[in-house]
Amino acid sequence: MAETTWNRHHVLSLADFSADELNIVLQTANSFKDVLYRKTKKVPTLQARLVTNLFFEPSTRTRSSFELAAKRLSADVLNFSPGTSSLSKGETILDTAKTFLAMGADMMVIRHQHSGVPQMIAQAMDDLGEQVGVLNAGDGFHEHPSQGLLDLFTLCTTLDPDQPTTHLLTGKKIAIVGDILHSRVARSNLSSLVTCGADVHLAGPPTLLPKEFADYGAQVHWSLEPALEQADFVMTLRLQHERMSQHLIPSIREYHQQFGITRDRIQRCQPQVKVLHPGPVNRGVEISSDLMDDESLSLIPHQVTSGIAVRMALLYLISNRSR
C-alpha cells in the first residue's frame, strides 16, 4: 500500500491536497478495487477498529458507501441518526461526538448541513489529544472530499485502469455543468482537477454560477456550448432544490432546455466523451434518461463502485494516523 508519505490525520477538504497526495489515494484505491470483485469481498485491514458514521443530514449513497467500505475492511461500524438521538433532547453536536469517542471510536465520518462542522469536531478531537481521524462526508456548501476523490478515481481509471495517476488528466478538458453555487461536490472537484492540471470549464445560469468561481482556476460560461466544445468529460450536477432559498431558475423545463445534457448536445464534445453525475439524478432535468442509461457514455455506475474503493482507501490511510 502507498502510505509512506501520507501525513493527514483528517480529510476535511481537497483545497490543500498536493498531486502527490491525490496519487496516494488513487494508488491505494486501485489496490482495494480488486477486493470488490473477489468472491470473498473482505480484508482484515481494520479489524477491531470502530468507524462511526455521524450523518446529521439525510444521505443514502454516501453513508451506505462509507459503511460498506468500512465493513469490507472488517471494521466495526456505528451509524448515527439525528432523528432518534439525544440531539432532539438538547444535546450539542460536540457532546454527541464525545459520546462516540467514549465508546472507542477510531474514526468519525461526518456529514452536516452547515459548513465547518467536521472541521470543528476534528479540532475538538485534536485539542483533547485524541488520535481520532475525521472524514468530511459533506458539509453545507463547503466541500465533499470523498466525492471529489471518487470522481477523480473514476476519471483516471477510465483513462488507464491499471495505473490511475493525476498526470492522465493534464490538459484534459472537463466540463462541470449545473448548480455550481450550491454544490459542495463542485468545489471539491474544482480543487482536485485544477491540481491535476485539467482544463476545467464551468457552465450554468448566472444565478447558479457566480463569476467568482473563476478564482478557482476554471473558466466560467453562462451558456452550455463553449463548455462542451471538445470536452473529454462532462460532469453534470443536481439542481439542489433543498438548498435554494429563492427562485433562481425560471422553471425546471427551461433549465433543461438550456443546460440539460443530451445525446445531441454532447456531439460538440470529443468522440470518446464520457458523462458523470454524483447522484441522485433528476432524470430529464440535468441529463436525459437515454444518455444516463447508455453504458458506452455514462460513468455513473462506475462512480458508485469507485466510491467504495476510494472510501476504503481513505479509511485505511487515516487509520494509520489514528490510534
Swiss-Prot record:
L-aspartate binds at K89, R184, R238. Carbamoyl phosphate binds at R61, T62, R111, H144, Q147, G279, P280. SUPFAM superfamilies: Aspartate/ornithine carbamoyltransferase (SSF53671). This is Aspartate carbamoyltransferase catalytic subunit. One of its GO terms (biological process) is 'de novo' pyrimidine nucleobase biosynthetic process. It comes from Acaryochloris marina (strain MBIC 11017). It is an enzyme of class 2 (transferase). GO terms for molecular function: amino acid binding; aspartate carbamoyltransferase activity. One of its GO terms (cellular component) is cytosol.
